[in-house]
């Protein structure tokens, strides 16, 4: 009945009962953020309680088949999801949505009728990223490029979005996005498994140049990928524009010689793989 006092009375009761101040404050802050733009819990203890509460609600309601439909959201699950994402991202917590939902679902035992509850909750939460970033003015295609890779660690998801948003401003972005679309179409038609690049098979200067460039970059960016420094990764990959353009201008991928054709497909497969470690930039407009 007194929604404005949610958490407040619990805090005062805890203080009255002699609980630690951190516990008392956490009882109040577990409901944060209460609305869009509201402040977050200040301590990690309060953040942990807030996340536990939100994931328990999301998993339980999805588990009984009561996911939001259309504009109806009687259990405020959209707010709970966005609140959880904000806490994880803005506090840069190394948490994975799948791990959290699995742990939450396990606590319900066999009481959840929805057998796909983990995937459903994770997909729902990733979908809330779209609304969040659109409110920030980030282009929809940037969000889609990251969603295509389905990273489930929110802080990592955010780092990818920031990196792709930056990449989109570079002079080479449009050409490389178009090239990646072309590469995707070519690889989709490959009729055999694609192996590794063999430099000794290269005959054209343009294909050798691209092969050497992607192999060098694969080694160079790996530590950056592991560090989550996606902006630097894409800055380095942007340098591929010239060799990529030269490759498509001077090399016929579907050569008659099977070994030559497979090696050229391997070059393109490696090129695509470099970008896919961050996002699917082929969806950029």
UniProtKB/Swiss-Prot annotation:
PROSITE patterns for the chain: AA_TRNA_LIGASE_II_GLYAB
GO terms classed as biological process: arginyl-tRNA aminoacylation; glycyl-tRNA aminoacylation
InterPro entries in UniProt: DALR_anticod-bd (IPR008909), Gly-tRNA-synth_bsu (IPR015944), Gly-tRNA-synth_heterodimer (IPR006194)
Pfam families: DALR_1 (PF05746), tRNA_synt_2f (PF02092)
Keywords tagged on the record: Aminoacyl-tRNA synthetase, ATP-binding, Cytoplasm, Ligase, Nucleotide-binding, Protein biosynthesis
EC number, UniProt record: 6.1.1.14
Subcellular localization(s) per the UniProt record: Cytoplasm
Alphabetized Gene3D superfamilies for the sequence: Isoleucyl-tRNA Synthetase, Domain 1
Recorded superkingdom: Bacteria
GO cellular component, as recorded: cytosol
Catalysed reaction equations from the record: tRNA(Gly) + glycine + ATP = glycyl-tRNA(Gly) + AMP + diphosphate
UniProt GO MF annotations: arginine-tRNA ligase activity; ATP binding; glycine-tRNA ligase activity
Alphabetical list of PANTHER family matching this protein: GLYCINE--TRNA LIGASE, CHLOROPLASTIC_MITOCHONDRIAL 2, GLYCYL-TRNA SYNTHETASE
Subunit relationships: Tetramer of two alpha and two beta subunits.
Family in the record: Belongs to the class-II aminoacyl-tRNA synthetase family.
Protein name (record): Glycine--tRNA ligase beta subunit
């Amino acid at each position: 009945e007194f929604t404005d006092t949610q958490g407040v009375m619990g805090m005062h009761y805890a203080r009255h009962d002699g609980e630690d101040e951190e516990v008392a404050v956490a009882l109040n802050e577990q409901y944060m953020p209460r609305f869009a733009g509201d402040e977050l819990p200040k301590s990690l203890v309060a953040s942990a309680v807030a996340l536990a509460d939100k994931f328990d609600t999301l998993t339980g309601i999805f588990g009984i088949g009561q996911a939001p439909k259309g504009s109806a959201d009687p259990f405020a699950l959209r707010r709970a999801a966005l609140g959880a994402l904000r806490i994880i991202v803005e506090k840069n917590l190394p948490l994975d949505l799948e791990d959290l939902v699995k742990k939450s679902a396990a606590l319900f035992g066999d009481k959840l009728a929805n057998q796909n509850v983990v995937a459903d909750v994770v997909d729902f939460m990733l979908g809330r990223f779209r609304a969040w970033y659109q409110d920030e003015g980030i282009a929809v295609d940037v969000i889609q490029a990251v969603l295509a890779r389905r990273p489930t660690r929110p802080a990592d998801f955010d780092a990818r979005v920031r990196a792709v948003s930056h990449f989109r401003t570079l002079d080479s972005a449009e050409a490389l996005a178009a090239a990646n679309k072309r590469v995707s179409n070519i690889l989709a038609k490959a009729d055999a498994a694609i192996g590794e690049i063999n430099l000794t098979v290269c005959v054209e200067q343009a294909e050798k140049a691209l092969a050497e460039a992607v192999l060098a970059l694969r080694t160079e960016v790996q530590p950056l990928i592991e560090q989550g420094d996606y902006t630097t990764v894409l800055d380095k990959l942007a340098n591929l524009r010239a060799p990529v353009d030269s490759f498509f201008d001077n090399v016929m991928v579907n050569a008659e010689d099977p070994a030559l054709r497979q090696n050229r497909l391997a070059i393109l497969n490696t090129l695509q793989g470099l970008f896919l470690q961050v996002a699917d930039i082929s969806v950029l407009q």
